[in-house]
Amino acid sequence: MKGIILAGGTGSRLHPLTKVTNKHLLPVYNKPMIYYPIETLMKIGIKDIIIVTGREHAGNFLNLLGSGVEFGAHFYYVLQDGAGGIAQALSLTEGIAGNESVVVILGDNIILDDVSQQVKDFKTGAIIFLKEVHDPGRFGVPVFGKTGKKLLKIEEKPNKPQSEYAVTGLYVYDYTVFDRIKKLKPSARGELEITDLNNLYLKDEKLNYAVLKGPWLDAGTFESLFESSKVIKDVLSKK
């Protein structure tokens, strides 16, 4: 099993900071943002990690992270030219991931739960991780059946969310993920959407979900970047 960190994008919501570096290299409390998804994957036991990023600041990632030896890991780097969506960025890793299952995490997502058991138990299909939030309409939102347990579909940033849960930026996929991505069509904004990929798995009754209990931080805006630093500081002070 390989880990994949998607760390591309322009980081426009964090301008002007991201004019000089990739947002995933910005500090969150006492370390660069990208260290957190690396730690999430390492905690699971994954040491082969593919990092997808844009061409402009790729050298900064290499200078900071190197080969991965300092982490006890092996890093692979893949360049994404332009913005084609999360699923498109994921597709670029096929040549390295091969026929293995993958754990995918967005580079600006900080997840403090230990999800190693869910990954250890994973056999086939896909897993998404949900978190109850006060503003689900900013994210992909799961729609459940009458019992509130059976997952019916996932809606991308709905105006009227049908649940209080958000789909976080942590996913587990089996080896069929790349063939499924090839079946996707660009959305209205011209991108291959991760929500469409997850719905493909759901259509085949191969999508499971787990609910995160601990903090989930999306550090992609100034407000959330600041809040993430506060939460990390509080967590560390209690250890």
Residue ranges of model-derived segments:
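Short, conserved catalytic or adaptor-binding loops enriched in Gly and charged residues
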Residues: 66-72, 143-146, 200-202
